[in-house]
Amino acid sequence: LTLEQGKPVKEAAGEVHGAAGLFDYFAEEAKRAQGRVLVRPTGQRSIVIKQPVGPVAAFSPWNFPLFLMARKLAPALAAGCSIICKPPEETPACCMALMRCVLDAGVPGHVAQMVFGVPDQVSTHLIASPIIRKISFTGSVPVGKHLMKLAADGVKRTTMELGGHAPVLVFDDCDLDRTLDIIVPQKFRNAGQVCVSPTRFYVQNGIYDRFVDEFTKRTEQLTVGNGLEDATEMGPLANERRPEAVGALIADAADKGARITTGGDVLGESGFFFRPTVIADVPLDAQIMANEPFGPVAMMRPLATLDEAIEQANRLPYGLAAFAFTEMAVRR
């Protein structure tokens, strides 16, 4: 996993254990796939029966290839569905190792399968097949929309987890050190290539400057390097396209007045390493405030009131995750 995707081996170990835990969970959940009897006011009884939907086509991403593949494989098998998995191009070997574990555990080869190939060709063929009855996809919003259109032709069920752009609300009554202890590692986990990664930081005026300074100091202390080395806290980005894409968003923000307090460029002359980056005073019209960077970039903006915080957090049509740090359980 580390060799293919780049994340530190400590994070990779956590992903492996997490993937195994999913199989344990859904193995137990299979016992609870029971129907219900509904009694109507007229005395009639309706029986609800849960049945397998049928063969599933599952498409998983490269950021958590084992965990997210397991999150599709395990529930499908527990529900009694066969499944064909299309792994990401960047991480074929670790996904194949997972499938080998499934087959070695006794799942028949005609029940769980894996296919490799050009993504668009594979997805078009599988989704158009009358055999496939459900599609599961984790990835970007544009690709998700494309797959939904393909699925619509066959009126097929879809389950999708698409992009996010998680807001972080930091109020001036928070325990600042504890907040930083939590949020800095969370931001740079897997080099920021996490769909629920904290990205848009809205910090109350009273602690804004201090928060930016302390966040920047901690960011500069991160060890970036080979994921196989024990000291490494952040590895490279996943492929050659990512550094350029992240750099373009940062450059656009800087051109529009944002202040880069640390990072902002590639690290080293080889590989896909990108320096952990903090950008302060980011204007709302910067592309990075609307487009998920999916990289090691934290964007900071000051805020004055709770109403402003809620407004800014909800200004984008993305859900998936949000963070808030305060000592008050109820604010108003």
Show which residues each predicted segment covers.
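A structural signal for short, well-ordered beta-strand elements
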Residues: 5, 172, 239, 299-304, ...
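ALDH superfamily catalytic-core signature
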Residues: 106, 134, 142-283, 306-307, ...
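Conserved glycine-rich beta-strand-loop-beta hairpin in the small C-terminal domain of fold type I
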Residues: 232-233, 271-274, 291-297, 316-320
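Rossmann-like NAD(P) dinucleotide-binding subdomain of oxidoreductase/dehydrogenase enzymes
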Residues: 35-178, 303
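Aromatic/hydrophobic pocket-lining residues that form π-stacking "cages" and hydrophobic walls in ligand
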Residues: 23, 72, 98, 147, ...
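Bilobed periplasmic-binding protein-like "clamshell/Venus-flytrap" ligand-binding domains
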Residues: 256-262, 318-326
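N-terminal Rossmann-like NAD(P)+-binding subdomain of aldehyde/semialdehyde dehydrogenases
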Residues: 1-44
